[in-house]
Amino acid sequence: MICRSFPVCSTQMERKKAGMKCVIFAGLPAAPELHSWWADADYVIAADAGYENACRVGVEPDLLLGDYDSAPRPEAGAKTVFLPAEKDDTDTYYAARKALELGATDVVIVGGLGGARLDHTLANLQTLVFLAKNGVCATLADTDNEVTALLPGTHRIQRSE
């Protein structure tokens, strides 16, 4: 039996070996116990309210991106991309596209599961599929869940203890 691990990376060590790791902070608060997900990030993007969430856990993003409909608008700067309020995709999806454009091979989205906006959770799940189809090992992570999109094929998933 041939098992593929692409795009699933079984350990964080494997993920780091894969190439550039980008962490995206989305709109829901990030728990400090998720520190291991962003500690070794090569690049950090904060999508809209994700900026406040990153700051709460002591992370200074490399790029701020969003329409700022759910957070105070930051001062314009070289590391800020302002998106139009009227658009077809979420701020987190735009952040994922930016990560892909920057050459990320591993993307972790924190603050993208649950909350009052089911539409955003579903959009974030679709974002995982988009990233997987583009060859990126991508995960949505919170304190209780790790979600990864699997493309057709055979996969070996290691049980977490």
Residue ranges of predicted features:
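Charged/polar low-complexity intrinsically disordered segments
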Residues: 12-17, 136
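Acidic/Gly/His-enriched mid-domain segments of enzyme catalytic cores or analogous surface patches
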Residues: 49-133
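Short, well-ordered, mixed-charge alpha-helical segments that flank or form enzyme active sites
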Residues: 32, 117-120, 147-151
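Short, acidic/small-residue loops that bind anionic groups at enzyme active sites
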Residues: 130-146
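N-terminal beta-strand-loop-alpha-helix module at the start
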Residues: 15-74
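Short beta-strand segments
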Residues: 24-26, 48, 110-112, 141-142
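Long, charged alpha-helical interface segments
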Residues: 143-145, 150-161
